[in-house]
Amino acid sequence: MVSQRVQALLNQLRTQGIADERVLEAIAQVPREKFVDEAFEHKAWENVALPIGQGQTISQPYMVARMTELLELTPESRVLEIGTGSGYQTAILAHLVHHVCSVERIKGLQWHARRRLKQLDLHNVSTRHGDGWLGWQARAPFDAIIVTAAPLEIPAALLSQLDNGGILVLPVGDEHQLLKRVRRRDGEFIIDTVEAVRFVPLVKGELA
């Protein structure tokens, strides 16, 4: 039995076009209040992005659901997330697939995200402190790659780590960003534009 706040959010997401019941169920199961600062807990189930420190944000639930839905995940999908952030998107993915790999360039965020995921008994996640532009070559190829910050162009390393038939979902651009879905098919990349979005930039390198 979900609370009224959770049900209200799920109804709003359905109205906004989210149709994948597995994604909606994951949204309902992951306690978003555990991934935000105490000062913002009262806003945790609102359909808004919230600050998490270090100039980063936790994406609004609609965008989390939309990007996750676009990945067309199955339980067997090998998933790479670029930008662990608070760990909220990671937790949603962990409810949908057997294992998630996630890269975060800011060490402090990675540490806190890993702690939160363990507290929620989500042990099917591997996190790594590193440069998201480079992906995670040692774990490639991936069936699905999701990027939660916006590069100016699609990183070549991520394209190379996408398996045949795989899907990459990411925002691209500077001031005017567009959400893109890239599907790899027989060595070619088919790119679709989904909608206008606003994300923090995907910065190269890693921070201690």
Curated annotation (Swiss-Prot):
The UniProt record lists the keyword Iron-sulfur: no
Keyword Coiled coil recorded: no
GO CC entries: cytoplasm
UniProt KW keywords: Cytoplasm, Methyltransferase, S-adenosyl-L-methionine, Transferase
Signal peptide extent: none
Pfam families: PCMT
A GO term for molecular function: protein-L-isoaspartate (D-aspartate) O-methyltransferase activity
Record-given protein name: Protein-L-isoaspartate O-methyltransferase
Organism in which the protein naturally occurs: Enterobacter sp. (strain 638)
